Amino acid sequence: MVLVQTGSSMPEPLYKSWIDAYHKEAASTQVRYMPVGSAESARNILAGSGDLGGGDAPIPETQLHAANKSVLELPAVLIGIVAIYELPGIKGELKLTGPVLANIFLGRIKTWNDSALTRLNPDMNLPALPIRVFHRTDGKGSNYILSDYLCKVSPEFLAIAGRSESPKWPAGQSFQRSQELVNQLHSTPGAIGYTELNLAVSSGVRMASIKNAAGEFVKPSSQSIAAAASAGGGKKNEDFRVSLTNAPGKESYPISSFTWLYVPAVAPDPERGRAVAAYLKWVYTSGQKIAQEQGYATLPADVLAKVAAKASTVH
């Protein structure tokens, strides 16, 4: 049997590792992954297309109600969105606050030696270089996570761009896929953009530390992302749609999130439903171990137990 899964391009490397490993254990089931983006994946699942979907944002309530269909939104792993930049020959680690990052993406801070940046980074010899803003195209989960955070720390960003998979960016160049953005940033002095932590690490791009809700500058890492999940209220929330951005706690990385699997509670075909349930059972056991080995922050134990229990109801 071939199961069709759509979803975000950010966790694609992990999902492909899962799919390969699962096929070795369950040879009769293949999973085909199509990285169509979070918004498109949600539309597909609500329309009855595909066996499971996924994305880096909760499905909008209006779409869920309009579809009149029971879809489970199950956290798969934790991810962090990191601010990445290209400043050749400039030593040091860039520090940013949420409001400063918001003003960069609003096009209000235009050069790297702007006083808002030099105040935060007195030890970096920031150049009089134009800032080139890179962002993702519409319908992307990374847009949602970043804009969710920026809307919490910047009233101006909330008013102008908004919290969305398709923010109204007033400035910058857009990219369809995360890897395209990273590749272009590498070869563009003065560029700033964002991507998922593991892709940033594997690509060797520089990442900024972000000031969190407790006033600490925190580097993105699987540990600081896990700290945000532990502090961010995911434990208490049974529907798993909770936002983890700007979480409390000194060690919390502030642009952290679940990435979700969108799963029809009842499959149109019982045999396919059983196959999806078996795959999910594997994801929340062996799959979590693989995610940890690949450097992802896995679900806290109490959240994992609740998610696995919910996943077992799929049929």
Per-range role (PLM):
Residues 1-315:
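Flexible loop/hinge segments at secondary-structure junctions
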